[in-house]
Every structure is written in structure tokens, then in C-alpha cells.
A protein has these predicted regions:
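Short acidic-hydrophobic catalytic motif
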Residues: 1-301
């Protein structure tokens, strides 16, 4: 199979989830074997940051990469959309530190890439393969991620938050061609009890209640709801059927597990090339995902 890039430039604008910065990202076509690179055009010299796991510097609520002190925050949704669009080579201009969150999914980025057109290049695509089954386990959080050798790619992700409103659930991606329909629309999520802590630690400066699903686990007083509404510059918020805040409805019954699968696809793109194998993950997260990627690199054929 040939490598692919986009046919023409395409841009998206919006607000970064964690930094709160408004900005624009622009995807540009790139030559064969270029890979995925970010360019910070708001900084003198327009420094480039390569989307590779050795450049990961932070995994707090998202994956941040950096080179020579230049950071790009929350790259996982962009990387997942590129994998979903089957794009190998692209240069991504950013005029701020963090790409726009859009609705918390990869849907709009994938749509933008497809609107630009996907074209084959005059170079063969190289797929990575593991020699044997690779297992990552994090005993403290109970996370396990496994990849077994195979001639195709598929992924299964399970989550369990010991929650009454977000039940244990599993998502399966049988083939990457299903990503656009089954995974890309699935949004990030958070528990109501985490909101104030995240705001206090400056982790969701650009968040509003349209960029994430908010699950309400415990009984919440009216005063707490009003305080959160004020934090997000809203007149009021409420709890609706299924323990979800602000009248959001799920795209899929297992949307949280599907979003965790989306995140893992994006973090695994930090391998630098697509990989063949069957991946099975229980309770994945950005720290575990990126450590798993490093372990894979140690076990490549």
C-alpha cells in the first residue's frame, strides 16, 4: 500500500480545552516519509515538533509533546483523526500551544481532512510489527494493554470506573475503515466531581459544557450546580436522564469506552508509523498509552 497525504490545505479554528487559547490549526500536504509534524507559527523561527513518543512530556488529561522547549498540548485527537483518515504525511501549523477541542471528539478534524482530499504518494507504506505478544501493566491503576502479532489491525478497549452512572463497558474497532462512523464522533468525558478540581489546576480553561460529556455520580445540591454554571458562564445547568449534565445525549450507549479507544489510537500514532496487530486494553489512559508505545518500540521486528 502507498503512503498518503492530503491534496490541499485545510484549517480549523476554535479554543483549546486546557489552555483556553483561541487559535487555528492548518493541515498542509507533506512529502513521502515526512510523517506527522506540528509547526508553531506563533513563535519566531516557526519551530517544529515531531509527533513521536520520545517527545511526550506530559500526560495530564491529555498528551503533550515538546521539542527544544516548544510544546503542543492535547495532540491525541488530531493524531487519531489522521489515522482515521489514513494519512501518513502532513505538516500541521498551529498559531498557539493547543489545537481547538471542537466538540471533544475527532469528528470535525476527520471531516476537514477528508474535505481536503486524500491522495496516494509514490512511496510504499511501512507497517510496524511486534515480534511477540507485548503486555503493559500498571498495578496502581489496574491498567493492562496487550498487542498480539497479526496481519491486520483491530482494537478492543474496556473501562470500569466503579460508577453507578458510567457502567463497565467495552468498545471494539474491527477495522480502521469503521473509525469514521464508529469512533470519530465519540466525545471526551469527565465526572462532575472532577470539574472544580480541574478548573482549580488550570486544566480546562477552554472547556464548556458542549465540549465534554459530564457524568454526575453522586447527589448534587442546587448550589453546586449553580457554582459550576457560573464557572462555565452559563445561567443554569441541570442533571438529566442517565446521570448526564446539561441535557447532553450519548451518541452511543458505550460512548466513553469508544472515546478511550479513540485516545489510544491517537497515542499509538506516536509510534510514527501504522502498526499491525490486535490490541486489547483495560482502563487505558494517556500515561499508560504512551508507556505502552515505548514498550512496543522495544519489541519491534
Amino acid at each position: 500500500m502507498k503512503q498518503k497525504t492530503i491534496k490541499q490545505d485545510v484549517s480549523l479554528s476554535g479554543t483549546g480545552l486546557h489552555t483556553g487559547q483561541k487559535g487555528t490549526l492548518t493541515f498542509h500536504p507533506a512529502e513521502a516519509n515526512h510523517g506527522i509534524k506540528f509547526r508553531r507559527i506563533d513563535i519566531e523561527g516557526c519551530p517544529v515538533v515531531e509527533a513521536k513518543v520520545e517527545n511526550v512530556v506530559d500526560t495530564s488529561r491529555g498528551t503533550t509533546i515538546a521539542q527544544n522547549g516548544v510544546r503542543v498540548y492535547t495532540v491525541e485527537h488530531i493524531l487519531a483523526s489522521l489515522r482515521g483518515a489514513d494519512v501518513d504525511n502532513v505538516l500541521i501549523d498551529l498559531d498557539c500551544e493547543e489545537p481547538p477541542i471542537q466538540d471533544g471528539s475527532a469528528r470535525y478534524m476527520l471531516e476537514a481532512l477528508k474535505s481536503a482530499g486524500i491522495v496516494e504518494q509514490d512511496a510504499e507504506r511501512e507497517y510496524l510489527r511486534v515480534k511477540n505478544t507485548v503486555t503493559y501493566f500498571h498495578p496502581k491503576i489496574g491498567c493492562e494493554i496487550i498487542i498480539t502479532p497479526a496481519d491486520d489491525f483491530r482494537m478492543e478497549v474496556s473501562v470500569d470506573y466503579k460508577s453507578q452512572v458510567l457502567k463497565p463497558q467495552t468498545a471494539v474497532l474491527k477495522r480502521m475503515s469503521d473509525f469514521e462512523r464508529e469512533i470519530a464522533p465519540c466525545r471526551t468525558f469527565v465526572f462532575f466531581q472532577e470539574l472544580e478540581m480541574l478548573l482549580k489546576h488550570n486544566l480546562i480553561k477552554g472547556g464548556d459544557l458542549s465540549t465534554a460529556i459530564v457524568f454526575v455520580e453522586d447527589a448534587v445540591q442546587a448550589g453546586e450546580l449553580q457554582r459550576v454554571a457560573k464557572l462555565f458562564n452559563m445561567e443554569s445547568v441541570g442533571i438529566h436522564q442517565g446521570g448526564i449534565l446539561n441535557n447532553t445525549t450519548l451518541h452511543f450507549e458505550n460512548e466513553p469506552a469508544r472515546h478511550k479507544l479513540l485516545d489510544l489510537i491517537g497515542d499509538m500514532a506516536l509510534l510514527g508509523k501504522p502498526i499491525l496487530g490486535h490490541v486489547k486494553a483495560f482502563k487505558p489512559g494517556h500515561l499508560a498509552n504512551t508507556e505502552f508505545v515505548k514498550l512496543i518500540i522495544e519489541n519491534l521486528e
